[in-house]
């Protein structure tokens, strides 16, 4: 009978909010309220169950013999359907209707996502074909920033390992999925960021979620400070951590410090932020954030997803770029000075953007990485990346470490596009990075602009709408690569200009009349300087330290577990 009461509590709000003592009193009285309650098919069952329980407890019985736990018998199972005497007019919850309504909401607010069938051609980069192979377009929004998806070195190594070791890893890292390719990749990543150790995940979304949630769950009283523009993966991890959190204004050091100062230095803290924010192209003040972290006793968690491969003399990201000369001189070795990169506690990155393959990772001190390896469910309970994938990632890292030409070509092509669009009054959101965000300001217009570029001009640029960006700040996100030279850039600029005219979209002067938005048309705004200087863009591979070419990198013990 106890099961009847439990089921009633799960179904009826009256029973759920009524104490056991109150139910007992109702079962022993005959007032109007009690009589009405007995008429309810749900509350009545709970009251009758309590009556039987009371009678049973009051009767003389033999002492019960203690027995081992046994499986439940069919008689002990409460059949909800038969006991509630469902009427013929009752229907089940309309699951499909609910889902349809939710989807209709997204269609109504123009945030419903349509996927374009775009098949990138390795031998014709940056070309792709649509559904029909003869229907070719130029891709201008890929995150394969350096075109490494077609790199001969990477493809050759992947094919070699695929032929020898097969298509899959065969299991988790703990059960048959750990191999020399995983050890090598983690060793390469640790060497790239000049950290002690690294750990590879299936994606950086998983890495961010797994690491941040674990830190918040395990470190008692941890307080997390998160930039308001952080990626969804970081937001998800912080939410799953259940730790106390503070959201600070984007790249606002004063706001961050005011929040850090609310806690004693002894309170564990973590500052989570990105180096390059992918939808606006802004770059974090990493060094100043490290200063605040040291002042207030906080760990630093830096997401370099949109920066690895793109910045620094060896592609380690913005943290490396901030000490460009020191890292250029030392090559694979750690510089003699304290660098920004060495001050950051944790760096997460991706192998699926500038490196052109797939996967995510985190780097840091040995104990920290071993702790994640030992405790993070997102790492422990998932199948390892295939050997061919990890081999391809290692090949990409080694290739980009030993060359500057792709990063420099990409930066030059980015500047060409930005300058030419600005000359025509196309509203490029100002930023110092490789991202070219073109402000539209309306979801429907952003979708129409993207469709026109694709269907009329054979140019694929994806519209970016809510929730990726705030409502009213919808945009087109353009990402030049080394393969987008002057001729392709000319075609793009002419096409965007044509679309803005055809749809009568706001240009820079129009936004200026409206008071400006996200840096576009803002009176008196300071000029934004690119992070790559003219001197750095003039460098060649001959300026690199020779020790970055095919270096011998020792395998990390922590990748397999450290013996004591």
Curated annotation (Swiss-Prot):
Protein's recorded name: 5-aminolevulinate synthase, mitochondrial
A biological-process GO annotation: protoporphyrinogen IX biosynthetic process
Compartment(s) of residence: Mitochondrion matrix
Modified residues (N6-(pyridoxal phosphate)lysine): 353
One Gene Ontology cellular component: mitochondrial matrix
Originating organism: Candida albicans (strain SC5314 / ATCC MYA-2876)
Top EC class, one word: transferase
Pfam entry (one): Aminotran_1_2
PANTHER family in the record: 2-AMINO-3-KETOBUTYRATE COENZYME A LIGASE, MITOCHONDRIAL, CLASS II AMINOTRANSFERASE/8-AMINO-7-OXONONANOATE SYNTHASE
């Amino acid at each position: 009978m106890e099961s009847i009461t439990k089921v009633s509590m799960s179904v009826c709000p009256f029973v759920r909010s009524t104490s056991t003592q109150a139910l007992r009193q109702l079962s022993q009285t005959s007032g109007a309220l009690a009589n009405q309650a007995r008429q309810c098919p749900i509350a009545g069952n709970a009251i009758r169950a309590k009556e039987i329980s009371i009678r049973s407890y009051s009767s003389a019985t033999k002492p019960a013999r203690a027995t081992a736990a046994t499986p439940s018998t069919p008689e002990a199972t409460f059949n909800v359907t038969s006991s509630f005497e469902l009427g013929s007019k009752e229907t089940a919850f309309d699951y499909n209707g609910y889902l349809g309504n939710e989807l209709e909401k997204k269609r109504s607010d123009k945030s419903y996502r349509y996927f374009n069938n775009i098949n990138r051609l390795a031998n014709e980069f940056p070309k792709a074909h649509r559904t029909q192979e003869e229907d070719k377009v130029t891709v201008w929004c890929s995150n394969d920033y350096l075109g490494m998806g077609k790199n001969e070195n990477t493809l050759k190594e992947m094919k070699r390992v695929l032929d020898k070791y097969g298509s899959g890893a065969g299991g988790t890292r703990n059960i048959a999925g750990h191999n020399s390719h995983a050890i090598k990749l983690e060793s390469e990543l640790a060497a790239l960021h000049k950290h002690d150790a690294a750990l590879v995940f299936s994606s950086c979304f998983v890495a961010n979620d797994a690491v941040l949630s674990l830190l918040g769950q395990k470190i008692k009283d941890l307080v997390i400070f998160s930039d308001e523009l952080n990626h969804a993966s970081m937001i998800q991890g912080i939410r799953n951590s259940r730790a106390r959190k503070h959201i600070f204004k984007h790249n606002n050091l004063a706001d961050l410090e005011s929040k850090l100062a609310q806690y004693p230095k002894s309170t564990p803290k973590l500052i989570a932020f990105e180096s390059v924010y992918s939808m606006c192209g802004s770059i974090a003040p990493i060094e100043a954030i490290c200063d605040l972290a040291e002042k207030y006793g906080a760990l630093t968690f830096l997401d370099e997803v949109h920066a690895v491969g793109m910045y620094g003399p060896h592609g380690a990201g913005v943290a490396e770029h901030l000490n460009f000369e020191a890292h250029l001189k030392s090559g694979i070795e750690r510089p003699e000075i304290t660098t920004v990169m060495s001050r950051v506690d944790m760096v997460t990155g991706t192998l699926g953007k500038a490196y052109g393959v797939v996967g995510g990772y985190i780097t840091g001190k040995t104990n920290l990485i071993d702790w994640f390896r030992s405790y993070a469910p997102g790492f422990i309970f998932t199948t390892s990346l295939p050997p061919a994938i990890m081999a391809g990632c290692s090949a990409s890292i080694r290739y980009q470490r030993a060359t500057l030409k792709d990063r420099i070509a990409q930066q030059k092509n980015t500047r060409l596009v930005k300058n030419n669009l600005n000359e025509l009054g196309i509203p490029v959101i100002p930023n110092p990075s490789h991202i070219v965000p073109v402000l539209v300001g309306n979801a429907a217009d952003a979708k129409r602009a993207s469709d026109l570029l694709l269907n009329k001009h054979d140019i694929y640029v994806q519209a970016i709408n809510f929730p990726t960006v705030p409502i009213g700040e919808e945009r087109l996100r353009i990402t030049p690569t080394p393969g987008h030279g002057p001729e392709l850039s000319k075609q793009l600029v002419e096409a965007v200009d044509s679309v803005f005219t055809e749809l009568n979209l706001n240009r820079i002067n129009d936004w200026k009349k409206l008071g400006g938005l996200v840096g576009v048309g803002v009176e008196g705004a300071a000029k934004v300087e690119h992070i790559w200087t003219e001197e750095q863009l003039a460098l060649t591979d001959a300026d690199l330290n020779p020790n970055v070419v095919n270096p011998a990198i020792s395998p990390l013990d922590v990748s397999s577990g450290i013996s004591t």
